[in-house]
């Protein structure tokens, strides 16, 4: 499927939906977490679709994959924040499971997007970047 802008990417769409869910959830965190976990969680979540968007216009495969790799790192950071938020009692088990499932969907689509870029790179050796 041909894309015209980063918003057409399923990886970006799912990552953006995850950001909205994180903002909704973290708005209920205790006030003392506003500049702690809340801020860190939101920044890491925003980094996922932001880096997908930034990598979208990069011309070289290595450049694209670098930004997608940063997005993957931020995704893993969020995976920890989901666990920490649950363990601190800031979300119930239903919210935890919903967010964990959503995060896993983002991960799978993002990994597929990276594989697609690698497969279209015509043999360039960029596998070390993902």
Annotate the PLM regions.
Residues 1-54, 58-130:
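Short, C-terminally biased terminal segments at protein or domain edges
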């Amino acid at each position: 499927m041909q894309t015209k802008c980063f918003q057409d990417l399923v990886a970006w769409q799912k990552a953006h939906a995850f950001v909205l869910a994180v903002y909704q959830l973290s708005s209920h965190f205790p006030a003392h977490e506003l500049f702690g976990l809340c801020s860190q969680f939101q920044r890491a979540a925003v980094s996922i679709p932001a880096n997908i968007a930034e990598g979208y216009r990069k011309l070289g495969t290595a450049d694209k994959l670098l930004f997608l790799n940063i997005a993957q790192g931020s995704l893993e950071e969020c995976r920890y924040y989901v666990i920490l938020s649950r363990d601190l009692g800031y979300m119930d088990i239903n919210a935890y499971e919903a967010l964990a499932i959503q995060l896993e969907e983002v991960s799978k689509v993002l990994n597929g997007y990276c594989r697609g870029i690698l497969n279209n790179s015509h043999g360039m050796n960029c596998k070390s970047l993902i």
